[in-house]
Amino acid sequence: MATSLGSNTYNRQNWEDSDFPILCQTCLGENPYIRMTKEKFGKECKICARPFTVFRWCPGVRMRFKKTEVCQTCSKMKNVCQTCLLDLEYGLPIQVRDTGLSVKDEVPRSDVNKEYYTQNMEREIANSDGTRPVGLLGKAPSSSDMLLKLARTTPYYKRNRPHICSFWVKGECKRGEECPYRHEKPTDPDDPLADQNIKDRYYGINDPVANKLLMRASTMPRLDVPDDKSITTLYIGGLGENVTDSELRNHFYQFGEIRTITIVQRQQCAFIQFATRQAAETAAEKSFNKLIINGRRLNVKWGRSQAARGKGEKDGVTESGIRLEPVPGLPGALPPPPVSDEDASTNYFNLAPTPSPAVMNLGLPPPPGVTMPPPPGFGPPMFHTMDPMAPPVPPPMALRPPGQVHYPSQDPQRMGAHASRHGGP
């Protein structure tokens, strides 16, 4: 096989020797004290196939060991991490970033052209200050609305977890808790995220993660401007405990005059009132799904007046615009019982009117010529003509059969009648 005179096999000057890797916060791990091994010219870059210095480390407890996959030249050309190949500024795949910045990839694929392009990029990197990307990425606009909405600045350390144990999936793992791999159910093999390629990630072609993020960006919600022109207040949620009044003012003062800033620490939110409606609309448009302070993505919404909030709750619509469906199975509203005008002032519990029982006045003697009936159980038996079709008359309370007990307190067996069995007097 014919090779060029400047190929990596003979040109050892192109081999890379570095002292520290270019990593993102997620790949580096949450532990600030890590032990990292360095192997000079340990492997060849998976993009340009040049030998480079390989770094290997463990990002945390119960995490898998990670190492650099591409050389620093390829990393600087795309401004990506040497391990995960995600953008260092936004934490997004290269395909998503290039789509948001309208940058077209022009990296050659053949061996000779790739080597020539790499040497030119190394020369450009050496002549730069090292603070900005080189090539087409350095000439692109600084930011994009889509990138600010999709940016993932918070580290996601679960990405460093060990791989799934293939023996456990087959039911043959005998290590138990000492197994360094995860004992979890694998993902669906038909899932497009299960098939990822490092070269597709670097060149931004057919990246399943990028396709998923781009589809999410196309269906991203928008912040509608309220019809009430008197509303000039914005709701800022998810503040946490570190966001202060001055930090909010430093961000929102550029959109217009701020009248008041009210921070509710208990709810971790704030209300920012602007002097004009135009300033509030500009702040909402420029900050919706883009506001990041102290590494926290804040939620921006329009404030609502008390009248609009009460109307929304009455119509079954929440503050976020979600319509609540009625709960099935509940009875409808019952009409109030009919109450006369005389009892309306004293019927506090809306009870049905009942006939008042006859009360015997024991303090006054009966009028002359009137004989009072004896109490129940003390007089002679009274015989009435019974209608065979009439329902039976219920017995009085004292003569009701003992088997009908509706509450535990009505049971005579549980009212201390047999306390002598337990050692009582």
From Swiss-Prot:
The keyword Cytoplasm applies. Required for pre-mRNA splicing as component of the activated spliceosome. Involved in the first step of pre-mRNA splicing. Binds directly to the internal stem-loop (ISL) domain of the U6 snRNA and to the pre-mRNA intron near the 5' splice site during the activation and catalytic phases of the spliceosome cycle. Required for normal early embryogenesis. This is Pre-mRNA-splicing factor RBM22. Coiled coil: none annotated. Keywords: Cytoplasm, Developmental protein, Metal-binding, mRNA processing, mRNA splicing, Nucleus, RNA-binding, Spliceosome, Zinc, Zinc-finger. The keyword Transmembrane helix does not apply. It comes from Danio rerio. GO terms for cellular component: cytoplasm; nucleus; Prp19 complex; U2-type catalytic step 1 spliceosome; U2-type catalytic step 2 spliceosome. A zinc finger (C3H1-type) spans 159-186. SUPFAM superfamilies: CCCH zinc finger, RNA-binding domain, RBD. Residues 232-305 form the RRM domain. The C-terminal RRM domain and the zinc finger motif are necessary for RNA-binding. Residues 389-399 have a biased composition (Pro residues). Its main location: nucleus. Residues 304-331, 384-425 are annotated as: Disordered. Component of the pre-catalytic and catalytic spliceosome complexes. Component of the postcatalytic spliceosome P complex.
